[in-house]
Amino acid sequence: MTSTLARATSASLRSQNVTPPTRTRVAADAPRPRTHLPTHLRPADLLRITDQGVADVLDGRHDALLPAEWDTTHRWSTRLYADDDLDVWLISWTPGEATELHDHAGSLGALTVLSGSLREYHWTGDDLAVRVLDAGDQAAFPLGWVHDVVKNPTIQVAGPTLSVHAYSPPLTAMSYYEVADAGHLRRTRTVLTDEPE
């Protein structure tokens, strides 16, 4: 069905002997154009995926992957999903165990807090900023994002503190940092890994 505006525009162009440009149809299965990102997934996609991961855990779809008893002294993680484009993890958080200041190399990331509360320290370019992420909160990590995540010590919950994380492309490396004098970061090491911090 053609709109009145489209018909009027076509008639106007024909009267001026202007040929409208030919539209090219792209097949639905045609590859997406390449972007500057290392993945076709965007941060918004990863946030949606982590939100779905939380729903799946709460619905019991991953019960077979969960420990029989929650370890309250050591962090653990379990992979919920993996393919060439995406890794999805369930991560536990215990008191006093920080991840260290790190990046995700060439991967984008996102998380949704399933239970409890996290405190994230992220590098702003000249200082560390802090944000608190409570159950249901989400955060995305663009390329170059440097942060340290820890269980929020000011919030006590009866069960474990858990979050679902997605990385695209899947993690292959992480660099670790320290804040140096004069307000800049110094890389301390880079490790090859296929597991989250």
Regions found by a protein language model. Give the residues of each.
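Conserved short histidine dyad/triad with adjacent acidic residue
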Residues: 89-104, 133, 142-144
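Intrinsically disordered, low-complexity, charge-dense segments enriched in Lys/Arg
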Residues: 145-152, 164, 173-178
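Short acidic-glycine-tyrosine-enriched beta hairpin
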Residues: 110, 122-151, 188-192
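Conserved double-stranded beta-helix
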Residues: 166-197
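A short glycine-rich, His/Asp/Glu-containing loop-to-beta-strand
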Residues: 66-95
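N-terminal leader/capping segments at the start of a protein or of a new domain
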Residues: 1-61
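Glycine- and acidic-residue-biased ligand/ion/polar-headgroup-sensing regions
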Residues: 95, 106-121
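A short hydrophobic beta-strand segment most commonly corresponding to one strand
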Residues: 110-112, 156-174
